Amino acid sequence: MTQIFNFSAGPAMLPVEVLRRAEQELCNWNGLGTSVMEISHRSKEFMQVAAESEQDLRDLLKIPSNYKVLFCHGGARAQFAAVPLNLLGERSTADYIDGGYWAHSAINEAEKYCTPNVIDVKTRIDDLRGIKPMREWKLSDDAAFVHYCPNETIDGIAIEEEPDFGDKIVVADYSSSILSRRIDVSRYGVIYAGAQKNIGPAGLTLVIVREDLLGKARRELPSILDYQVLADNDSMFNTPPTFAWYLSGMVFKWLKEHGGLAEMEKRNQEKADLLYSAIDGNDFYRNDVALANRSRMNVPFLLADSALDKVFLEESVAAGLHALKGHRVVGGMRASIYNAMPLEGVKALTEFMADFARRHG
């Protein structure tokens, strides 16, 4: 059987070692004779899973002790509402950086709760799509916080620069790039991320929030989205997505066993360099993102003749390269190469691309 490499943007590929262990433990976890999906979230066995998961995540990201780690429901879209309702307080505005599709989605949700100051940072660099450097972001004085998305999965645009905005509260949607590289958590007030790209299966959402920002929620905020309530209840205010939590915990251990975030950053750069080189080195393919803002996680590309898109997708699936269809908003192709994607998968893709170009160019 041809080895399958899954380039889906999310739910995305999980480490093979994690899946195999989950398969082995599925019906008899920890010698209990039952699945981890079937035990109480308040049992001592699952509480150990929860505690180890949090500690491993803290170790990986070097999360300071004055930050709470929350394991939540709802995905990033729930956080689009939770962030303003938890952080606005008595203020009526917040700075929202518009750098792409998902940043704009957060803005649309925020408009229900405040008057966002929208700062469009998209620009053209050598006729390619790019992002203005942070020093050019025109932040307002009265904003409750600054919100941005460091990696746009659809646009294939990344903001690698870390924020340095003095005492402003910075909120970042790290859904598609968390754990892919080292970051300084202390520069942020809130970091949130849906799990289904670089953490684990869909259904779990991580929130990392500085403790001094707790307890400021608006009265109308549903309790299940209140960071203070979730922190006070150790993310167990209601039954959490236990299986997704368990699998994510195994991914954290896998990351630590494979060298942590420094090693992931190195591997991800190597994979991205290989794929972008294959695109740039062949006139048959094109990526229109400026070099400084190219995503290491999500690589969109266009074929010279869009009439060949369907053939490319059919032949790629036959070659064991799945989920390469670009998002409906931009079309073309997209290869998502998160932590779990091995270098061998990217090599297989680039070899297929070269062969396809030879046959159809």
UniProtKB/Swiss-Prot annotation:
Xref: Gene3D superfamilies: Aspartate Aminotransferase, domain 1 (3.90.1150.10), Type I PLP-dependent aspartate aminotransferase-like (Major domain) (3.40.640.10)
GO molecular function: O-phospho-L-serine:2-oxoglutarate aminotransferase activity; pyridoxal phosphate binding
N6-(pyridoxal phosphate)lysine modifications at: K197
One GO CC annotation: cytoplasm
Named cofactor requirement(s): pyridoxal 5'-phosphate
Keywords noted in UniProt: Amino-acid biosynthesis, Aminotransferase, Cytoplasm, Pyridoxal phosphate, Pyridoxine biosynthesis, Serine biosynthesis, Transferase
InterPro entries: Aminotrans_V_dom, Aminotrans_V_PyrdxlP_BS, Pser_aminoTfrase, PyrdxlP-dep_Trfase, PyrdxlP-dep_Trfase_major, PyrdxlP-dep_Trfase_small
Catalyzed chemical reaction(s): O-phospho-L-serine + 2-oxoglutarate = 3-phosphooxypyruvate + L-glutamate; 4-(phosphooxy)-L-threonine + 2-oxoglutarate = (R)-3-hydroxy-2-oxo-4-phosphooxybutanoate + L-glutamate
Binding residues for L-glutamate: R42
Localization per Swiss-Prot or TrEMBL: Cytoplasm
EC number: 2.6.1.52
Top-level taxon in the UniProt lineage: Bacteria
Cleavable signal peptide: none
SUPFAM superfamilies, per the entry: PLP-dependent transferases
Cofactor binding notes: Binds 1 pyridoxal phosphate per subunit.
BP GO annotations: L-serine biosynthetic process; pyridoxine biosynthetic process
SUBUNIT field: Homodimer.
UniProt-listed PANTHER family: PHOSPHOSERINE AMINOTRANSFERASE
Name by which UniProt lists this protein: Phosphoserine aminotransferase
